[in-house]
Amino acid sequence: MDAEADIPYGTLDLTVLKTLDVMGSLHGYGIGRRIEQVAEGSLALNQGTIYPALLRLEQKGWITSKWGASENNRRARFYEITRAGKKQLAAETESWQRTVAIVTRLLEHEP
């Protein structure tokens, strides 16, 4: 993808959980930047999207947060994936892989 696109519907939780699983503790801005970096700039993830998702994931018990200092010594909330979050990540990854396989078969099918 050359142009920026919004993150595909239904993948935000998956990408946030995966980012925290790989990177460890990160603040919200760092999570968003890391997702954009891995997507090589092809996804746009605005802060109005990431913070409600982080709150929702924390309420579900899939992540935890604590206050700390960012790289520029500003106060920031840092997030970490929980054991329940790792289980959810595994389930969502499996579901996403099944969905991709089905859509791929449908797109490649010729009568």
Name the predicted role of every residue range.
Residues H27-G28, F78, L89:
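Amphipathic alpha-helical segments enriched in hydrophobic/aromatic and basic residues
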Residues I50-L57:
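Basic amphipathic alpha-helical segments that dock to polyanions
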Residues E58-R75, E80:
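Beta-hairpin "wing" of winged helix-turn-helix
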Residues M1-G10, E92:
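Intrinsically disordered, low-complexity serine/threonine- and proline-rich regulatory segments
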Residues D6-T49:
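N-terminal helix-turn-helix DNA-binding core of bacterial DNA-binding proteins
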Residues K86-P111:
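Amphipathic alpha-helical dimerization/coiled-coil segments
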Residues I81-G85:
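Accessory beta->alpha helical hairpin/"wing" motif in late/C-terminal subdomains of nucleic-acid enzymes
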